[in-house]
């Protein structure tokens, strides 16, 4: 399609930007729906379905809970002295020893999980006047009755159970975790049969704390043939402190201590299989990539993970505003320039030129403007990831029934944090998208102004992103405009001459209407003047008589 007013003595140069047939809708601060040429999804919404064992050291709990492994349940002996970054508890885990409860289960579980080890050191406790190593048919170790391997069930010796008073100092330079307990028989007869006294008491103290527990005799629901229970407690003995155990019966004594370590180990409930693969971020659903700043797979995470948000999708604009090319314009399509629409078919570039001159038509990219825009946009995704990825884990929170109000408060706090981060994510992405679109528009305007300053009076802005050049401009001339070496003085005289010649015969449509109306008005006025003059002349000659009647 020939451009208006184009001949061998003139040329047309249009500036335009990249466009695609089907763009991507993104959100900005000023517009909820704006189309761009390209965008990147920021929300990871699916997992691999498996837990990767690298770079984190994963310990599969299989059919054991962490607490059962800690106590030494016979079917969990394989976990003795194990270490982990993440302990994975399965839904099919079960206890297979004497029924027990842990009054502060969640705290103990979290404490041991964060320590990342079940390293156990046996100590030489002296229990005089009692029978050690009690067992139960509810806790078989092989064919024989057994018990938790990390605990020592003490019962009467003969017909006596003396008051026990044992001291164990911590002379090491690390903290020690002692696990102990108290037995609650189901009947008074069982109480006296095992411990002689009608009621037992256990006191465990350090310089910093003291716990006093009294046995609670009574029948409970039968579990593995037992209606009695054991309550498990724990005490941390700091370096330089002393552990003191005093009891007159019902004591489930420690055999040693667990070495406490500080670290970023954790625990997670999941039934996802463990596989040989690499992933920094783990959720109960499986590992997920952390190349996006946000995820909505699961609130519970371990490792360097995207921030959890409620949104299913958030798109970051990585391209410019998209204005699809009008396909009805023929060969040149969007020759009108960037003000009307974009240009499709531009490969690997964002900005460019199209021209028509005596040598034909052509198109070329402006790599400098393209690179300037790309350089500023490329780092956006990494910057958003740096702002949002958590370098720590979000663990499960558990509370006992008596801590219901605390649990409600914790849930409220977590939900509020998620709401806040979801809102922050929306605003952050909208701001970045607004900046991207403003940036790419600015680069287009810079290129247009640069071209205008070069051409000066040698060309006319056609108002649609194009310039009409009023001198012969071959391909070499066009190239000089594109690369910034154009010398307008060389063509100045020719351009002025051609401009006057063309303006003499070619009027802009905006002025043509005015001139037509003015010409029509003048013609009507002259016609009226001539007609009035003829009437007056005829009246003077007597050829026309005018009678006025009242």
Curated annotation (Swiss-Prot):
GO terms for biological process: clathrin-dependent endocytosis of virus by host cell; fusion of virus membrane with host endosome membrane; fusion of virus membrane with host plasma membrane; virion attachment to host cell. Keywords: Clathrin- and caveolin-independent endocytosis of virus by host, Clathrin-mediated endocytosis of virus by host, Disulfide bond, Fusion of virus membrane with host endosomal membrane, Fusion of virus membrane with host membrane, Glycoprotein, Hemagglutinin, Host cell membrane, Host membrane, Host-virus interaction, Lipoprotein, Membrane, Palmitate, Transmembrane, Transmembrane helix, Viral attachment to host cell, Viral envelope protein, Viral penetration into host cytoplasm, Virion, Virus endocytosis by host, Virus entry into host cell. Disulfide bonds join 14-466, 52-277, 64-76, 97-139, 281-305, 473-477. A lipid is attached at residues 539, 546, 549 (S-palmitoyl cysteine). One of its GO terms (molecular function) is host cell surface receptor binding. Its main location: virion. GO terms for cellular component: host cell plasma membrane; membrane; viral envelope; virion membrane. Pfam families: Hemagglutinin. InterPro entries: Capsid_hemagglutn, Hemagglutn_HA1_a/b_dom_sf, Hemagglutn_influenz_A, Hemagglutn_influenz_A/B. Glycans are attached at residues 22, 38, 165, 285, 483. The record marks 329-330 as: Cleavage. It comes from the Viruses. The chain crosses the membrane at residues 515-535. It is a single-pass type I membrane protein. Homotrimer of disulfide-linked HA1-HA2. Binds to sialic acid-containing receptors on the cell surface, bringing about the attachment of the virus particle to the cell. This attachment induces virion internalization either through clathrin-dependent endocytosis or through clathrin- and caveolin-independent pathway. Plays a major role in the determination of host range restriction and virulence. Class I viral fusion protein. Responsible for penetration of the virus into the cell cytoplasm by mediating the fusion of the membrane of the endocytosed virus particle with the endosomal membrane. Belongs to the influenza viruses hemagglutinin family. Major glycoprotein, comprises over 80% of the envelope proteins present in virus particle. The extent of infection into host organism is determined by HA. Influenza viruses bud from the apical surface of polarized epithelial cells (e.g. bronchial epithelial cells) into lumen of lungs and are therefore usually pneumotropic. The reason is that HA is cleaved by tryptase clara which is restricted to lungs. However, HAs of H5 and H7 pantropic avian viruses subtypes can be cleaved by furin and subtilisin-type enzymes, allowing the virus to grow in other organs than lungs. This is Hemagglutinin. It comes from Influenza A virus (strain A/Duck/Hong Kong/231/1977 H3). The lineage of its organism: Viruses, Riboviria, Orthornavirae, Negarnaviricota, Polyploviricotina.
């Amino acid at each position: 399609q020939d451009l208006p007013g184009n001949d061998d003595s003139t040329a047309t140069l249009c500036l335009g930007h990249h466009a695609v047939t089907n763009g991507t809708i993104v959100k900005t601060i000023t517009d909820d729906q704006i189309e761009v040429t390209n965008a990147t999804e920021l929300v990871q919404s699916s997992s691999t379905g498996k837990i990767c064992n690298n770079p984190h050291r994963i310990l599969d709990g299989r059919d054991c809970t962490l607490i059962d492994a800690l106590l030494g349940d016979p079917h969990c002996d394989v976990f003795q002295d194990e270490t982990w970054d993440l302990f994975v508890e399965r839904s099919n885990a079960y206890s297979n020893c004497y029924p027990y409860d842990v009054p502060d289960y969640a705290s103990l579980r979290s404490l041991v999980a964060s320590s990342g080890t079940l390293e156990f050191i046996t100590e030489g406790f002296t229990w005089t006047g009692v029978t050690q190593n009690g067992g139960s048919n509810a806790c078989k170790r092989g064919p024989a009755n057994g018990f938790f391997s990390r605990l020592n069930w003490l019962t009467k010796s003969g017909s006596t159970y003396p008051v026990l008073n044992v001291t164990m100092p911590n002379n090491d330079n690390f903290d020690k975790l002692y696990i102990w307990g108290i037995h609650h028989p189901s009947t008074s007869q069982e109480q006296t049969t095992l411990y002689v006294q009608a009621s037992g008491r256990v006191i465990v103290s350090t310089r910093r704390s003291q716990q006093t527990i009294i046995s609670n005799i009574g029948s409970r629901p039968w579990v593995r043939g037992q209606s009695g229970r054991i309550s498990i407690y724990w005490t941390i003995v700091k370096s330089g402190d002393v552990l003191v155990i005093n009891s007159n019966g019902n004591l489930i004594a420690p055999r040693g201590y667990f070495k406490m370590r500080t670290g970023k180990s954790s625990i997670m409930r999941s039934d996802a299989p463990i596989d040989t693969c690499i992933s920094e971020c783990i959720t109960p659903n499986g590992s997920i990539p952390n190349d996006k700043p946000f995820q909505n797979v699961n609130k519970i995470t371990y490792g360097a993970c995207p921030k959890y948000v409620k949104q299913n999708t958030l798109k970051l604009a990585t391209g410019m505003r998209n204005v699809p090319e009008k396909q009805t314009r023929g060969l040149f399509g969007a020759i009108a320039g960037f003000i009307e629409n974009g240009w499709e078919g531009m490969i690997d570039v964002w900005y460019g030129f199209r021209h028509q001159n005596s040598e034909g038509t052509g198109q070329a990219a402006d790599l400098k403007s393209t690179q300037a825009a790309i350089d500023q946009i490329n780092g956006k995704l990494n910057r958003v990831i740096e702002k949002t990825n958590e370098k720590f884990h979000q663990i499960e929170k558990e509370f006992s029934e008596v801590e219901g109000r605390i649990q409600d408060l914790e849930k409220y706090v977590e939900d509020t944090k998620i709401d806040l981060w979801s809102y922050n994510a929306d605003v952050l992405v909208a701001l970045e998208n607004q900046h991207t679109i403003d940036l790419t528009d600015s680069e287009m305007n810079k290129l247009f102004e640069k071209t205008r300053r070069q051409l000066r009076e040698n060309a006319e802005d056609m108002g649609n992103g194009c310039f009409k050049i009023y001198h012969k401009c071959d391909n070499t001339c066009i190239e000089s405009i594109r690369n910034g070496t154009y010398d307008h003085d060389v063509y100045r005289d020719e351009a002025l001459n051609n401009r006057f010649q063309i303006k003499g015969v070619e009027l802009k449509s905006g002025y043509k209407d005015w001139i037509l109306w003015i010409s029509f008005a003048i013609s009507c006025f002259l016609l009226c003047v001539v007609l009035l003059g003829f009437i007056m002349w005829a009246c003077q000659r007597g050829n026309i008589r005018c009678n006025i009647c009242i």
